[in-house]
Each structure stands twice: as C-alpha cells, then as structure tokens.
C-alpha cells in the first residue's frame, strides 16, 4: 500500500504550480496602490490592515512602492502624481485599477474613454517589456530651456493632463534626456491629418506618429536612449513630453509578474493589464472569482490575498502556469520558465508516463522506502518476541 501511495503521490500530486506571485531570492520589488500601501492605514476610519491584499509583515521590508488612489499610468499622464520608485531583480506589479472605465476619463465631452483604455494597454506593454531588462524604475521631469506658452485642452472634473503639454508651434523645440539608461516618453496627437516627430540629434533616429482615427488624445509610448531630441510637427501646435519613466541598472532578462488590478463587479473594470502582459516578458496572475473585500467591497479579497501570499517565501521556479516550490519533478511542464525549474516533458501529462530519468530516481526512492518499512517491521517483531 505504501508503494502505491508513493507512486501516485509522485506521479499525480507532487510539486504542482501555484497561482501566486513570488521571487527566487530576496532581490525583488513590488509596485502597487492602496491594496499594498501600508501607510494608508493612517487615513482610515477603522485602523486595521484588512484593506491590504499583502501580508502586513511585508510592510517594513523596503521592497514596496505603493500609493492609495494612484497608478503608474495616472502618475505618468496627470497632475495627480506619486513618484513610483524602486529597484529589484524580480519586479511585481499590482496596480492599474485607479484608471479604468469606472473613471470614464476623456479629454472632451464628445471624446472617448475607449481611446484612453487603448493608451493604457500601450503604456503598460512598454513598461512591462522594458522592466524585464532593468532593475531600477522612477519618474524624471523633462526640462525645457525656453519659455513655453502652454495650454491644457485635456481635463475632466477629476483629472488634468500635464504630460504631454501643448504649445503653439512657432519655433523648433528641443529636449535632452540624461542620467538614465532608457526613457519612456509619450507621443500623443488628437484626431487630425497631421503628424509629429521626435528626432535624435545625435544618432539621426526618427520617431513619428499620426492620428486620423481616434476621437480623443491618441498616444504611443516610445523608448528613447539618452540624447538630445528635436520635436517637429506638421500641425499648428506641438505636444511636448514633460515626464518620463526612467529605467536604469540593466540586468539579464527577467520576466515581470503582474497581478490583475480590478474592482468588485459592481464597478466597471477593464482587461488592459492582461492584454499588455504577454510572454515572454511578463507573467499574468488572476483570481477566477469576483473581487469581494473584507474591509470594504474593493479591499481585502481572499483570492488576491492568496495570490500575493507568495511574496512571503522564495520559490525555485517561476513560469507561465505558476510558481514551483521545488526543482525536482512536476506533472506540469514549466512553460516559459525562469529559475531552477523541475524536470518534465509534455504539458499536462503525468511524469511517470514519459520521463525516463525521474522514473529511475523514483524507483530508487521507492525501494529505499520499502526497505525502511521492512526494517521497522523487523524491529517491531523482535521487540514483541522479547
């Protein structure tokens, strides 16, 4: 019976992938919002940690940059700003919900929130893919050495755009990016028959964009190397970047991990993060159930608490299907894996069917287990005979 039990244990239930975000070692960092903002407790009527989706023991480890009511996308574009800053080899994102269809943002009354959700997808796709190659992330301002007569034609009752800004195009405008390895800047246009370009004066590279389709501010997000750039357009006004995401301290490729950031079903959410988070640069984790918090309906959900609980311990392997605690055997192939990963061959096939070396190792383990049981029975028999 013991042999049968061990056989099925090793073949069908050992070291299955876990639906959590975690890390291979202590060199990790999390970017989040109120669900991981430990300082937000000071602003709450009921001062407890039930609103968190992370374990409170993580609050003072210096590995979290989070702010209630904020998101990296919102801070990138609008006057509502939090300087997300952090460094780590393995990067986790759990934010984004604070800009979604529930806020219904658009530049004009006849504009389109759908355009902004498309902008959100493009932004996070660029953020995730870049962050797989860099350890450090922060915001930087883009200075201009000329006086700019700007106008703001994009704001709502809750948000006001300040990246990019718009100026009348009367002369050439330049900006310089120095100090970081890579920058993410917006290039945005309203619906028109015009185009705009960034020219790298040092290399001659040209980055251009035109928008003749979308009835709102349509943006692409361009990764620029350090250098001096000239802004040119065929339109009567320029859109100028004022803030950039700074990527620094390059590393070997490490996929980022993204946890879905959404409301309870009573509020409208979107799928921008899952669309933006694609292999091979990003692993996406989600709960199959509705978000139902215990502090309030949008804070403290047990499913997402379970996903974030993986931050409490190191794992051996991170993959598309989940994380693996051990590096020995598994019944699920660690697809697009990173770390010290278990051996297996065919997705969703039990290991005992095909992997020859693990079968030999399992046979040795089973024989040792059998000999141990026989030895215990022998000792028990001798003890009774005396």
UniProtKB/Swiss-Prot annotation:
Compartments where located: Virion membrane; Host cell membrane
GO biological process: fusion of virus membrane with host plasma membrane
Region (Receptor binding): 122-236
InterPro entries assigned to the protein according to its UniProt record, in alphabetical order: Capsid_hemagglutn (IPR008980), HEMA (IPR042545), Hemagglutn-estrase_core (IPR007142), Hemagglutn-estrase_hemagglutn (IPR003860)
Disulphides: 38-59, 107-154, 180-246, 188-219, 277-282, 317-341
Function as written in the Swiss-Prot or TrEMBL entry: Structural protein that makes short spikes at the surface of the virus. Contains receptor binding and receptor-destroying activities. Mediates de-O-acetylation of N-acetyl-4-O-acetylneuraminic acid, which is probably the receptor determinant recognized by the virus on the surface of erythrocytes and susceptible cells. This receptor-destroying activity is important for virus release as it probably helps preventing self-aggregation and ensures the efficient spread of the progeny virus from cell to cell.
Name of this chain's protein: Hemagglutinin-esterase
Organism field: Human coronavirus HKU1 (isolate N1) (HCoV-HKU1)
Organism classification: Viruses, Riboviria, Orthornavirae, Pisuviricota, Pisoniviricetes
């Amino acid at each position: 019976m013991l042999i049968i039990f061990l056989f099925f244990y090793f073949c069908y239930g050992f070291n299955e992938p876990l639906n959590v975000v975690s890390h291979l070692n202590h060199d990790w960092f999390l970017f989040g919002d109120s669900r991981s903002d430990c300082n937000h407790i000071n602003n709450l009527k009921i001062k407890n940690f039930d609103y968190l989706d992370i374990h409170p023991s993580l609050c003072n480890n210096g590995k979290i940059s989070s702010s209630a009511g904020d998101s990296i996308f919102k801070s990138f574009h609008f006057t509502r700003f939090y300087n997300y800053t952090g460094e780590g080899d393995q990067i986790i994102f759990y934010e984004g919900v604070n800009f979604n269809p529930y806020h219904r943002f658009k530049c004009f009354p006849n504009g389109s929130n759908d355009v902004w959700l498309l902008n959100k997808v493009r932004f996070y796709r660029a953020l995730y893919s870049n962050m797989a190659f860099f350890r450090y992330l922060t915001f930087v301002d883009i200075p201009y050495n000329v006086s700019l007569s700007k106008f703001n034609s994009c704001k709502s009752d809750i948000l006001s755009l300040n990246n990019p800004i718009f100026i009348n195009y009367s002369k050439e405008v330049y900006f310089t990016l120095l100090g970081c390895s890579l920058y993410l800047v917006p290039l945005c246009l309203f619906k028109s028959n015009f185009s705009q370009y960034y020219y790298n004066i040092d290399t001659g590279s040209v980055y251009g964009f035109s928008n003749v389709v979308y009835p709102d501010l349509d943006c692409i997000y361009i990764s620029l190397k350090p250098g001096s750039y000239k802004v040119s357009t065929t339109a009567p006004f320029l859109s100028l970047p004022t803030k950039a995401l700074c990527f620094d301290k390059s590393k070997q490729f490490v996929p980022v991990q993204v946890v879905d950031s959404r409301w309870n079903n009573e509020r409208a959410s979107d799928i921008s993060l899952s669309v933006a988070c694609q292999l091979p640069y990003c692993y996406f984790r989600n709960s199959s159930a509705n978000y139902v918090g215990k502090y309030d309906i949008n804070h403290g959900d047990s499913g997402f608490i379970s996903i974030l609980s993986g931050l409490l311990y190191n794992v051996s392997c991170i993959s598309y299907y989940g994380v693996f605690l051990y590096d020995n055997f598994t019944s699920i192939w660690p697809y697009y894996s990173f770390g010290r990963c278990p051996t297996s061959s065919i997705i969703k096939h039990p290991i005992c069917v095909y992997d020859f070396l693990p079968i030999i190792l399992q046979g040795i383990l089973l024989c040792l287990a059998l000999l141990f049981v026989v030895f215990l029975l022998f000792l028990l028999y001798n003890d009774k005979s005396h």
